[in-house]
Amino acid sequence: MLINARITEKSFKKWKFFSSSAKTIFQNFDVCISSSLASKNYLRLLGAKKISYFGNLKFTQSKQTTNELGNNLNKFFLTKKIWCASSTHGIEEKLCANTHKKLKVKYKNLLTIIIPRHIHRVKKILQDIKEMNLKIHLHDSKKKIDKKTDIYLVNTFGQTQSFFKISKTVFLGGSIIKHGGQNPLEAAKYGCQILHGPNIWNFKEIYNLLKANGASHKVATPNQLTLKVSKILNNKSNSKKLQLKIKNLSSKILNSTLNEINFHIKKK
């Protein structure tokens, strides 16, 4: 059995160079359970005979234990209306800082958390945002934070989920620039509304599934990002409802996959 199989367009083209070997390999699987409809089609073209698709098993991964932020930070965050920009690249930090600048007129206690994809860029991000006349604080669980802080810039690994936990909405980077997007599942599991740009080809089917469940939204322009963040911050809907939706979806995918596996085991 081949489980949660992922064949990208790039890897499919490589397999096609060895089409005879590929057919010999894939047709010998009792069942190929694909992670996406695109992968299902590629598996068929490569010679797989029995192919099933129920959804991506990444949906079924449980939440990791969050690295708690400490009492001082948690007390500060409780006084703020928070949104987060995660896995940002290049121009995306300035885009989100501009959104903050527009929204702080309406939300006096607004805090924007920025978690860049590559933390070696922190020095440049600090400089860019300071030039925008915004007050920025570099992540430090012990250092006292100015109450007027606009941007909270994270420069560490391993705490992203702790910030998702306290955010109502998350903009996921690598999607305004042509990078292909970032995996939205972690943020969705914490009940965050996901915002993304138009370039999400690496996770297109996952985003489509989240969109169908009211959990993700495309923003193609700076103005759209500002309007969408504002709308979500105004919405009093409970994130626990969204978490429950994602949990039910993951259970359905897992149970269907296990039933398929058990069916083929019993046939042996």
Protein language model annotation of sequence segments:
Residues 1-268:
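Nucleotide-activated sugar donor-binding and catalytic core shared by glycosyltransferases
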